[in-house]
Amino acid sequence: MAEINSLSEFSAVTSLTETHENVVPIHVQKLDSQGRAYATGKRKGAVARVWLKPGFGKITINNKEFDKYFARPVLRMILRQPIVAINRDTQFDIIATVTGGGLSGQAGAVRHGISKALTYYEPEFRTILKKRGFLTRDSRVVERKKYGKAKARRSFQFSKR
């Protein structure tokens, strides 16, 4: 690099370089040695580890079929939302291990993990999934109980006399 001795030389050099506005971030495919995309998803107290590979639409959670693990139809619908959003219902096999939290939090964590894994497998899916809000980590957690209160915000019954 050339020696810069004055402020005018520095401004001349920096004006020639590209601005950051023109640079577009490039998302590349991230796969492991077996051709799988790996991602972690979180929701409430649940953490899900998700592996996505080409297949026939089989979803396994903690070594169980997903419809056996999540008995409620609402939870199964939450789980399948990212795959349905990109119209690839039967193109990927999904293996997930999920710990912590309740069933609702676990379903949300697996959905978040599937969405991230889909973007790692095929970066073009990112715009669709981002627009639907599947890539955003839902940071809402239960508010802690405070001392002097019955619950987080509920006070004990007040009596004037």
Swiss-Prot record:
Ribonucleoprotein as UniProt keyword: yes
GO terms, molecular function: RNA binding; structural constituent of ribosome
PROSITE patterns on file: RIBOSOMAL_S9 (PS00360)
Keyword Ligase attached: no
Listed GO biological process terms: translation
Entry keywords, A to Z: Ribonucleoprotein, Ribosomal protein
GO CC, any one term: cytosolic small ribosomal subunit
HAMAP family, sorted: Ribosomal_uS9_B
Record-linked PANTHER family: RIBOSOMAL PROTEIN S9, SMALL RIBOSOMAL SUBUNIT PROTEIN US9M
Family as reported in the entry's similarity comment: Belongs to the universal ribosomal protein uS9 family.
Protein name according to UniProt: Small ribosomal subunit protein uS9
Source organism of the structure: Bartonella quintana (strain Toulouse) (Rochalimaea quintana)
